[in-house]
């Protein structure tokens, strides 16, 4: 193997959890270079929501690294599988989306993913093209490739089965159809989160059954949300959306802990691994303030999604707030257990931002209250449980709270 192959391998390997089978990725990269045949890299996403958050961009960032090495990305929009619903990590059967919901969500994906991906090295596909055309006998043939016992090896299925909770037959079809996507597009490598490991390996098995060379599987970590504990999720409220306004995105990134900052660098930044190691040493020795390193990260990510001018404006605005002591940086996270979703006005009193609910409601009407950087003026606003919020009361008073279900 040449040094060039080794460098490419190290770039791809950085930040990954699994590269399966072990030891094959380097050889596959070298063979692609030798034969002048770009690898076909598969990345699939079900359009279950209209917008993406940075958790999805961990995979897109890794896909772009493959593209920069000359390989071709097959971006599969799971418009068919979204109507089944991915059971991964679910304790109950997931509600399937309608065709209309899927189409509406999918329409927003292209402009968002091409903020990262190279359009010249990307093929966008919809898996309804081949899954929707399957005849009943072909579906039976796919189902015959896997046993119920193998399906129950999945942790989520096994837990539900052991707890006597129902598992619908169509949920068993999901990993099979995701795996068949790899057969249909002849994937060489498939990318996915660690929670998708089982499904990705099903793709290898099906390719073998259909006489194809099995794909390699590369898994990436699940990105933690702003709380640094749970995975980034819209339902938990701890997310940074790709479409967040520049100042809001910048501020959210600056609100993460210094520890979590290195995680975001490793999974989202284009700063080389060697440079990241140097930055960590400088921060640990006191040679550089971690805040300044975090400013660089916030600037890089905002620039990627919104452009240089917007990133510069967001940077200047943040520093202006900081100099006036208006920044929420390094605020402690207050965990609050509640039996029901609270009114924002009551929560402001509970965290000692407002002296009374009447004061809180008055400030809301005046436009002096923000939640996650968004102004909230409706005094009747209720916040959902199992979510993390940044509260701002007036210009200088902030609180970070994690609302949890409890007594």
From Swiss-Prot:
CDD domains: S4, TyrRS_core
Free-text function comment from the UniProt entry: Catalyzes the attachment of tyrosine to tRNA(Tyr) in a two-step reaction: tyrosine is first activated by ATP to form Tyr-AMP and then transferred to the acceptor end of tRNA(Tyr).
The protein's enzyme class: ligase
Span of the signal peptide: none
Motif 'HIGH' region: where in chain: 47-56
Keywords annotated in UniProt: Aminoacyl-tRNA synthetase, ATP-binding, Cytoplasm, Ligase, Nucleotide-binding, Protein biosynthesis, RNA-binding
Quaternary structure and partners: Homodimer.
Sequence motif 'KMSKS' region, residues: 231-235
Database matches in NCBIfam families: tyrS
Protein name: Tyrosine--tRNA ligase
């Amino acid at each position: 193997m040449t040094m060039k192959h080794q460098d490419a391998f190290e770039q791809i390997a950085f930040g990954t959890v699994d590269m399966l089978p072990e030891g094959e990725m380097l050889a596959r990269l070298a063979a692609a270079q030798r034969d002048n045949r770009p690898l076909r890299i598969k990345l699939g996403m079900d359009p279950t929501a209209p917008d993406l958050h940075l958790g999805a961009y961990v995979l897109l960032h890794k896909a772009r690294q493959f593209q920069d090495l000359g390989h071709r990305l097959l971006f599969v929009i799971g418009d068919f599988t979204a109507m089944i619903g991915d059971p991964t990590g679910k304790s109950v059967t997931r509600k399937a989306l309608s065709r209309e919901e899927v189409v509406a969500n999918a329409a927003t994906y292209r402009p968002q993913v091409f903020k990262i991906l190279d359009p010249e090295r990307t093929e966008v596909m919809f898996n309804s093209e081949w899954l929707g055309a399957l005849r009943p006998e072909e579906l039976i043939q796919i189902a015959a490739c896997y046993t119920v016992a193998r399906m129950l090896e999945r942790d989520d299925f096994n837990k539900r089965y052991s707890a006597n909770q129902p598992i619908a037959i169509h949920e068993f079809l999901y990993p099979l159809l995701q795996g068949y996507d790899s057969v249909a597009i002849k994937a060489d490598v498939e990318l996915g989160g660690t929670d998708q490991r089982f499904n990705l390996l099903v793709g290898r098995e099906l390719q073998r059954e259909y006489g194809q060379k099995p794909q390699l599987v590369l898994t990436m970590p699940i990105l933690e949300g702003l709380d640094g504990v749970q995975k980034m999720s819209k339902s938990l409220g701890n997310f940074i959306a790709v479409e967040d306004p520049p100042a809001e995105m910048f501020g959210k990134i600056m609100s993460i802990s210094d520890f979590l900052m290195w995680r975001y660098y490793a999974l989202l930044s284009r700063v080389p691994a060697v440079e990241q190691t140097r930055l960590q040493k400088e921060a640990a020795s006191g040679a550089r303030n971690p805040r300044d390193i975090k400013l660089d990260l916030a600037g890089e990510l905002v620039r990627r999604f919104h452009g240089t001018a917007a990133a510069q404006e967001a940077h200047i605005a943040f520093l202006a707030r900081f100099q006036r002591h208006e920044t929420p940086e390094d605020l402690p996270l207050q965990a609050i257990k509640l039996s029901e979703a609270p009114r924002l006005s009551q929560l402001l009193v509970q965290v000692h931002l407002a002296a009374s609910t009447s004061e809180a409601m008055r400030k809301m009407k005046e436009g002096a209250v923000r939640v996650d950087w968004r102004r909230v003026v409706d005094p009747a606003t209720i916040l959902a449980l199992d979510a993390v919020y940044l509260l701002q009361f007036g210009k200088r008073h902030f609180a970070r709270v994690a609302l949890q279900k409890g007594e």
